[in-house]
C-alpha cells in the first residue's frame, strides 16, 4: 500500500478514488491534487511510479489533512462552547445547531428515546 499524508491508500483502486480515503480529501480535492501533479485520475495506485507518488505526497502536504484537520475542527467547536454562544451551547447539549425543530424529529442528534412515564387517568 502507498502512504500519503500518513494514510495507507488502497492499491487496487483508481488514484482519484484512493485519495478520498484521506480525511479532508473528497472527490473535488482529489481531482485538484491530480490536476496539480499531472497524474491521470484513471491510473491504478499500484501502477504509479515512485516519482508520481512523491508528487502526490508533496501536493497533499499543501492542504490541512488528517490529524491537523481533526484538531482544527475540535478546537473550533471548543471555542464556540467556551465563549458561550448559542451554537456552542447547542453542541454541548447535543441538540441540532442550525435551527431545526426538536419537538419532534432530531432523533439522530438527541439519541435514542428516553421513555417517560405517562400520566395516570
UniProtKB/Swiss-Prot annotation:
Residues 97-121 are annotated as: Disordered. InterPro entries: Rbsml_uS13_C, Ribosomal_uS13, Ribosomal_uS13-like_H2TH, Ribosomal_uS13_bac-type, Ribosomal_uS13_CS. It holds the Pfam family Ribosomal_S13. Keywords: Ribonucleoprotein, Ribosomal protein, RNA-binding, rRNA-binding, tRNA-binding. Disulfide bonds: none annotated. One of its GO terms (biological process) is translation. GO terms for cellular component: cytosol; small ribosomal subunit. GO terms for molecular function: rRNA binding; structural constituent of ribosome; tRNA binding. Residues 100-121 have a biased composition (Basic residues). Coiled coil: none annotated. Part of the 30S ribosomal subunit. Forms a loose heterodimer with protein S19. Forms two bridges to the 50S subunit in the 70S ribosome. Located at the top of the head of the 30S subunit, it contacts several helices of the 16S rRNA. In the 70S ribosome it contacts the 23S rRNA (bridge B1a) and protein L5 of the 50S subunit (bridge B1b), connecting the 2 subunits; these bridges are implicated in subunit movement. Contacts the tRNAs in the A and P-sites. Belongs to the universal ribosomal protein uS13 family. This is Small ribosomal subunit protein uS13. It comes from Parasynechococcus marenigrum (strain WH8102). The gene is rpsM.
Amino acid at each position: 500500500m502507498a502512504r500519503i499524508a500518513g494514510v495507507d491508500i488502497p492499491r487496487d483502486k483508481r488514484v482519484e478514488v484512493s485519495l478520498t480515503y484521506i480525511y479532508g480529501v473528497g472527490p473535488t480535492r482529489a481531482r485538484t491534487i491530480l490536476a496539480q501533479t499531472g497524474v491521470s485520475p484513471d491510473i491504478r495506485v499500484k501502477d504509479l511510479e515512485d516519482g508520481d507518488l512523491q508528487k502526490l505526497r508533496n501536493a497533499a502536504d499543501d492542504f490541512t489533512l488528517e490529524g491537523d484537520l481533526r484538531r482544527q475542527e475540535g478546537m473550533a467547536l471548543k471555542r464556540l462552547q467556551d465563549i458561550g454562544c448559542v451554537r456552542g451551547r447547542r453542541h454541548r447539549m447535543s441538540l441540532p445547531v442550525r435551527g431545526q425543530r426538536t419537538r419532534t424529529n432530531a432523533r439522530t442528534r438527541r439519541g435514542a428515546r428516553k421513555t417517560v412515564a405517562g400520566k395516570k387517568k
